[in-house]
Design a protein with these regions (language model features):
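Surface-exposed, low-hydrophobicity interaction/linker segments
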Residues: 1-38, 68
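Long beta-strand-rich cores associated with HINT superfamily self-processing modules
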Residues: 35-202
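Low-complexity, intrinsically disordered segments with a bias for serine/threonine
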Residues: 205-206
């Protein structure tokens, strides 16, 4: 944050009181993973990578410069891998109650932290609008299912119709969030032999 301020890039940390997942939150997540993937508790704990998380917020017009600066600083220090949570490429997420860039940062010891990158608008909508809708969906349905998958299950009477209604509410709410300019996608970043992948390989629109 201090380095970005020196570069005249405005940034702030959001929600530091939630940087560590609570015991209840972790227990709930372990339970969901065990049920969905049919794994043991020990296996489920190894699959959870977001026990520590931070959220960095930028003004919309400074978003891309801010994100690239943070990635560069992390790779110059103790971290060697930046990936999008659960995916092969890093991009602005749309869907499932999330709007922003959500990354996992890892070191040689396979210690990971989650860093979310938001604009002032996207964090406001996430906190006040999307999160309550997502929690309603998560508590009553399988939130990982797409709308299309839910509709297929409904044909077989394998899902509560309310789940589709919750999902549609979430999709409608997401459309209200402005997407920053110059956002497209970026390949996962890794550091090899102390050399950083060229950040220019990130396909941000200029």
């Amino acid at each position: 944050i201090k380095d970005m301020k020196k570069m005249n890039i405005e940034a702030s940390l959001f929600g530091l009181m939630y940087k560590l997942k609570s015991q209840k939150s972790l227990a709930d997540k372990y339970s969901r993973i065990m049920k969905r993937q049919n794994v043991t508790l020990n296996e489920a704990t190894k699959l959870v990578k977001d026990g520590i998380r931070f959220t960095i917020v930028f003004p919309k017009e400074k978003y891309v410069d801010g994100v690239l600066n943070v990635w560069s600083q992390l790779l110059k220090n103790d971290f060697n891998s930046i990936t999008r949570k659960g995916k092969d490429e890093i991009r602005w997420d749309v869907g499932d109650g999330y709007q922003g860039i959500n990354t996992l940062i890892s070191n040689d010891n396979d210690t990971s932290i989650e860093i979310q990158f938001h604009t002032k608008n996207s964090i406001k909508y996430k906190d006040k609008l999307l999160h309550p809708l997502y929690e309603k969906l998560r508590k009553n349905c399988d939130e990982k299912l797409s709308l299309k998958e839910m509709e297929e299950k409904l044909k077989k009477s394998n899902i509560n119709p309310k789940c589709i209604s919750y999902k549609k509410d979430l999709i409608r709410a997401e459309k209200k969030i402005p997407i920053p300019e110059r956002i497209k996608k970026c390949k996962s970043l890794k550091k090899k032999n102390n050399r950083i992948n060229d950040l220019k390989s990130c396909q941000f629109i200029t």
